[in-house]
Amino acid sequence: SHNIHIEQNKMLCSKCHASVNRHGELSMTRADCLSCHHSEENNCETCHEIQVQFYSGTIGILDDEESDIMFEEDIDCRACHDPGDQVIGKSEASFCIDCHDSDYEEVLINWQDSIQQQHDKLTSDLNLIDPDKLDTVNQNKLLSIQQGLDKITADKSLGAHNYELISRILEEFQRNVNQMLD
């Protein structure tokens, strides 16, 4: 947050913090934050580039990436993240049933559980690899896997933005890691 506001956007500390009662105390309310963030004219991609890249299938990790089916149907971010005109960061599984049947709430939960399990296994297996014992090709693969995994972690959706793509990426990474461990 400070990196984005102070370093990238060159905002003054006093924009959010006051020294009236106690130096550095946050003086802004959620409404103040929302006056800049998530206003109608803001494009989600401006701040949520990784999430949009996963959703649109343009993250650049695999050669044959596909967009999420909801992206194909022109469902924008606000459909899941703006129920009732109150923008939220993390969409709730219960919001799925606003457009889908009641069983669909479990679909998202199952997707996220599956991605979490894949992510945890891959992370655990990565810790078993000694990069110094790998040849240059595998060292480069390992670096790509770590960078891709960082993007998946930064997405924070556990597959909600594109379950099929994120699952395929993790499967491909796991295959490569398994080969390195053999």
Task: Please report, for each region that a protein language model flagged, where it lies by residue.
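Inter-heme linker and motif-flanking segments adjacent to c-type heme-binding CXXCH motifs
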Residues: 1-118, 132-136, 152-164, 168
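Short, charged low-complexity intrinsically disordered segments located at boundaries
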Residues: 77, 128-130, 177-182
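Histidine-centered catalytic/metal-binding microenvironments
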Residues: 139-182
